[in-house]
From Swiss-Prot:
A plastoquinone binds at residues 215, 262. Pfam families: Photo_RC. Fe cation binds at residues 215, 269. This is Photosystem II D2 protein. Chlorophyll a ChlzD2 binds at residue 118. GO terms for molecular function: chlorophyll binding; electron transporter, transferring electrons within the cyclic electron transport pathway of photosynthesis activity; iron ion binding; oxygen evolving activity. One of its GO terms (cellular component) is chloroplast thylakoid membrane. Chlorophyll a PD2 binds at residue 198. 2 of the reaction center chlorophylls (ChlD1 and ChlD2) are entirely coordinated by water.
Amino acid sequence: MTIALGKFTKDEKDLFDIMDDWLRRDRFVFVGWSGLLLFPCAYFALGGWFTGTTFVTSWYTHGLASSYLEGCNFLTAAVSTPANSLAHSLLLLWGPEAQGDFTRWCQLGGLWTFVALHGAFALIGFMLRQFELARSVQLRPYNAIAFSGPIAVFVSVFLIYPLGQSGWFFAPSFGVAAIFRFILFFQGFHNWTLNPFHMMGVAGVLGAALLCAIHGATVENTLFEDGDGANTFRAFNPTQAEETYSMVTANRFWSQIFGVAFSNKRWLHFFMLFVPVTGLWMSALGVVGLALNLRAYDFVSQEIRAAEDPEFETFYTKNILLNEGIRAWMAAQDQPHENLIFPEEVLPRGNAL
């Protein structure tokens, strides 16, 4: 019995092969199979956001002006979430809420679900694009793995959190000031800054910034003089075979500064990948917990003592009172349909006031 080993070749190209050749052709902007998801979704998400911030009011959903047409600027314009009464409706243009009326669809907040869903798929398409290109040029897929961090944060904040609450209403609106207000909401209603997952996220993001600054400075400090150029960018040939900077010198420097240093480039760069991506994933997990109304750290003993002893107060008890004030003010403003009324005497006052 004879077994022939070799690559199977087809006599004719089928439709898939033709599509594959065209999509993955070497061109200025790579398209690829991932581009079939990325480019349309990114186009619709950005187009929806620009349309909403330019023309669409939030009067019917939040009682607010939110467009350039109404006098907002770049920092205050937003594509606002649908009203609380619409719960988790997808708000399809042809759905029972808008019934094909584009103006009514915009008034109800349909652009928010449109931008959120297309934005999520666009981000996923961008990650798949990195996978596809890495496979094409035989690279490892760590760029795509790193980009999973921002995707996890986006999906957890804009989709999973409101799904755990009563509706899309409680997700962030797509705007700068709107995101700031959402952060205040997270603090007031979830005590987010005292959540251990938030702490890990802050450590990851700020730690990554520190690592980038240290790494960039160290490389600049230990560059070899490979040429007589006037600055860093002209002093070496981009196609040179030898190293650009001295890892040995950098290792000796940081060993003297800290007593420890990275011994090789692989471990150094893996650590620079690990710190921010892990921080983003931890933040995303924390937001998933908030969707289920899981609580942050509670120091009840301090709260009880502050309630009993007029002279005892900590930064923690002051922050708890601040959170109560945020809830009292924001709930009445954000949820007028609940007819919430908080008399002056029930608003929180700290012992120091």
